[in-house]
């Protein structure tokens, strides 16, 4: 299992350039499969999830040229060569499920996707995806091995109301609707900035697609596509991650390309606990300004709320903030397990099955903890940790950087490779001492 040694009591200073958004890039690669036209993507992050998606597209028939130094991918899929996704792709992440929507127009007699893997943050049901596809005319068969979708008579536009504004379901239904005849209206849709980026990409490709302020997306089926050149938006999760690392280490980091309009809920909560930042034309500077004050309710939500991927690193900030703070996780039902690692380091965290806010969420009757109380500030001690999922991984690295008592061993670091480009190099250039397992003797 890949691991690193992270030395504590470190102050991070300098600048870092945020990469293109993981959650936009992977979806745009899938969207390029809608047609046989050429697509050029710029600002592409060199991360494992993108590498896996590129490999998946190649297996399906895409011709891909990736200039990693220039951060540019050119992809062209003259025809689809495979209608069954190899299992090695589904066990890594959840991207393959989007092929059900993206490829039904080009493969009407069936697409098969094996059972999915990804982060250990809950089952994340596919019910919304599959029911929406059925309303468009798809035939769905579910087995122990995976999911089979077909549309031998073609897809037809429909009115779909999602029970919950699921990001993945919204993306899948947008892609399927592009290949349907007529008009599709999706109500209660997710409208995260990555979905808006997908919509802009599709508009460039010739798709008539619009949104409005009440979470409604209107799509007209498209038969004639254009070639597209598109620059991927900066990754708001990576930007916030380095911003939190600056504040918790009592340092100062300029995050180049960070866009404040994508991060307003995060910046609002960061300011409420005393975290410092200043917005510039080409990025955001984050810094430690004064002792952090807790006593906040951090409630995750879909856009335009505080996104769930910011929650885990923010818990490290709350562990160093004076007072009692509450986390209420409303998006994923199993996303607080990582707190055990922070408790091992000395953080004071209590888990609850109840909704610890005035608003009950969809997990209020569930039998799992989805609320937490964090008491701070508490000094953290270096220890051994195993990363359970991507964003918890960065939280553990943040905690290790400020820990007392030497260095922390952190294992399963390949999780970080999924979502952070050159994360180790970026941290080292900011002043961190981060060593791979085979080179630890340098600092011993």
UniProtKB/Swiss-Prot annotation:
EC number: 2.5.1.7
Keywords: Cell cycle, Cell division, Cell shape, Cell wall biogenesis/degradation, Cytoplasm, Peptidoglycan synthesis, Transferase
Amino-acid positions noted as binding UDP-N-acetyl-alpha-D-glucosamine in the UniProt annotation, renumbered to this chain: 94, 309, 331
Principal location listed in the UniProt entry: cytoplasm
Subcellular location: Cytoplasm
Recorded catalytic activity of this chain's protein: phosphoenolpyruvate + UDP-N-acetyl-alpha-D-glucosamine = UDP-N-acetyl-3-O-(1-carboxyvinyl)-alpha-D-glucosamine + phosphate
Family named by the database record: Belongs to the EPSP synthase family. MurA subfamily.
Name under which the protein is recorded: UDP-N-acetylglucosamine 1-carboxyvinyltransferase
Species whose genome carries this gene: Chlamydia trachomatis serovar D (strain ATCC VR-885 / DSM 19411 / UW-3/Cx)
Gene name per UniProt: murA
């Amino acid at each position: 299992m890949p691991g690193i040694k992270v030395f504590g009591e470190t102050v991070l200073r300098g600048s870092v350039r945020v990469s293109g958004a993981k959650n936009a890039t992977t979806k745009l690669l899938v969207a390029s499969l809608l047609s046989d036209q050429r697509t050029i993507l710029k600002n592409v992050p060199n991360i494992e999830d993108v590498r896996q998606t590129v490999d998946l597209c190649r297996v399906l028939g895409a011709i891909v040229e990736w200039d990693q130094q220039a951060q540019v991918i050119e992809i062209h899929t003259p025809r689809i060569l495979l209608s069954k996704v190899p299992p090695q792709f589904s066990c890594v992440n959840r991207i393959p499920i989007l092929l059900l929507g993206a490829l039904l127009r080009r493969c009407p007699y069936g697409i098969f996707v094996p059972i999915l893997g990804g982060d250990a943050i809950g089952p994340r049901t596919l019910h919304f995806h599959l029911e929406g596809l059925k309303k468009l005319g798809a035939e769905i068969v579910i087995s122990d091995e995976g999911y089979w979708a077909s549309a031998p008579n073609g897809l037809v536009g429909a009115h779909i109301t999602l029970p919950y504004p699921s990001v993945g379901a919204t993306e899948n239904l947008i892609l399927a609707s592009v290949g349907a005849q007529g008009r599709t209206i999706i109500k209660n849709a997710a409208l995260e900035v990555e979905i808006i980026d997908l919509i802009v990409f599709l508009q460039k490709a010739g798709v008539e697609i619009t949104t409005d302020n009440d979470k409604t997306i209107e799509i007209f089926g498209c038969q004639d596509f254009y070639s597209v050149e598109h620059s991927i938006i900066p990754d708001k999760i990576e930007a916030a991650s380095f911003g939190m690392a600056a504040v918790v280490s009592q340092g100062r980091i300029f995050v180049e390309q960070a866009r404040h309009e994508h991060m307003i809920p995060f910046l609002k909560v960061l300011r409420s606990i005393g975290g410092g930042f200043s917005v510039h034309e080409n990025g955001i500077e984050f810094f430690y300004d004064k002792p952090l004050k807790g006593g906040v309710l951090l409630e995750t939500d879909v856009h335009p709320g505080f996104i769930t991927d910011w929650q885990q690193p923010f818990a490290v900030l709350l562990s160093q903030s004076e007072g009692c703070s509450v986390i209420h996780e409303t998006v994923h039902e199993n996303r607080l397990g990582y707190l055990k690692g922070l408790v091992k380091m000395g953080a004071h965290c209590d888990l609850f099955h109840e909704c610890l806010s005035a608003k009950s969420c969809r997990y209020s009757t569930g039998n799992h903890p989805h609320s937490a109380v964090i008491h701070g500030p508490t000094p953290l001690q270096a220890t051994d940790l195993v990363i359970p999922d991507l964003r918890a991984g960065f939280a553990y690295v943040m905690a290790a950087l400020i820990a007392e008592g030497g260095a922390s061993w952190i294992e399963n670091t390949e999780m970080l490779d999924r979502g952070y480009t050159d994360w180790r190099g970026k941290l080292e250039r900011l002043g961190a001492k981060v060593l791979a397992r085979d080179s630890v003797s340098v600092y011993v």
